[in-house]
Design a protein with these regions (language model features):
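Acidic, surface-exposed loops and disordered segments
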Residues: 1-179
Length: 179
């Protein structure tokens, strides 16, 4: 059991944002496995306030790409998960935003578990969330864009070349103990 614990901790710590992809398909079963993990995210009162669009269609990817500085990432990814908060399922905004964050983290971890795939959570597109809703003909009264996760086969040459270790704040910088 102890070794599983350490493996899980190491697994979480080795997840990285991947912004460079090579051309390659992702099977429907793999996509469904990732979505299955996502749906197990915790949510207050188990309201599961998420709605997700799986975008592989080139025209839709291009329309999304036009709305963000991250256009090359959206276009080069095999698929983009476009995640919305379902406002009709919402009961407490803060708790629902936390649930969406957990949902999106589960996607990132599930993609990381495949080892050959990578993903990045894109938030800059939120500046154009109404236009994203228009692409999908979704009411802004019912759905609010929370983010896009681009997923594809990692371009190992770029990932290894960049190889930088991202700095993380030390625990002392943000942890206070009350004992």
């Amino acid at each position: 059991m102890e070794s599983d614990y350490k493996k899980i901790l190491e697994f979480i710590k080795t997840r990285r944002s991947v912004r460079n992809f090579v051309e390659g398909k992702i099977s429907r079963n793999t996509i469904l496995d990732v979505l299955e993990c996502a749906r197990w995210a915790p949510s207050g009162r188990n309201n599961q306030p998420w709605r997700i669009h799986v975008v592989t269609h080139l025209t839709v990817k291009s329309l999304l790409a036009e709305l963000t500085e991250d256009s090359s990432i959206i276009k080069s990814a095999f698929l983009n998960f476009v995640i919305f908060l379902d406002l009709e399922r919402s009961y407490d905004r803060v708790k629902d935003l936390q649930a969406i964050g957990a949902f999106m983290q589960n996607i990132l971890l599930a993609v990381h578990a495949t080892s050959k795939l990578g993903a990045v959570w894109l938030g800059e597109i939120l500046n154009k969330k109404e236009k994203v809703n228009n692409i999908f003909k979704l009411s802004t009264i019912k759905y609010e864009l929370m983010g896009v996760i681009a997923v594809g086969e990692k371009d190992e040459s770029v990932e290894k070349a960049s190889g930088e270790e991202r700095e993380r704040r030390s625990l002392d910088e943000f942890v206070d103990w009350f004992q």
